[in-house]
């Protein structure tokens, strides 16, 4: 509640807010992630209780904004590997995760995501 007076402008939730058991700066390789039926990442409710019942980061963002600060989240590019393995449907599309994923496009330090072909319009529903 006193951050703004000390020059803070932004509050950013760092990576792996969608991983229920993240507890340190170490990644859990191939950990289960929280996502909706379309493979879109959701906040882990056990770590962000205000996200319950589909609220997402809305309540937390509103609180941060009420303090006069800006709210953001760290996101990784691509589609969750878990969505590809489950072959989730892509929102507003007749396509599925395996059709848009570039499984050879991976991040060397984080195993959560596969790349998505940016030229492939079928992948826009995951964004």
Regions found by a protein language model. Give the residues of each.
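Aromatic-lined carbohydrate-binding/catalytic grooves of carbohydrate-active enzymes
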Residues: 1-127
């Amino acid at each position: 509640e006193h951050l703004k007076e000390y020059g803070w402008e932004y509050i950013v939730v760092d990576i792996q807010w969608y991983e229920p058991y993240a507890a340190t700066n170490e990644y859990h390789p191939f950990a289960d992630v929280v996502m909706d039926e379309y493979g879109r990442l959701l906040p882990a409710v056990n770590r962000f209780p205000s996200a319950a019942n589909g609220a997402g980061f809305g309540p937390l963002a509103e609180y941060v904004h009420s303090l006069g600060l800006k709210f953001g989240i760290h996101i990784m590019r691509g589609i969750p590997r878990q969505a590809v393995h489950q072959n989730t449907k892509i929102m507003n599309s007749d396509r599925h995760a395996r059709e848009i994923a570039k499984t050879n496009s991976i991040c060397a330090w984080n195993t959560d995501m596969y790349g998505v072909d940016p030229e492939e319009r079928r992948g826009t529903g995951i964004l």
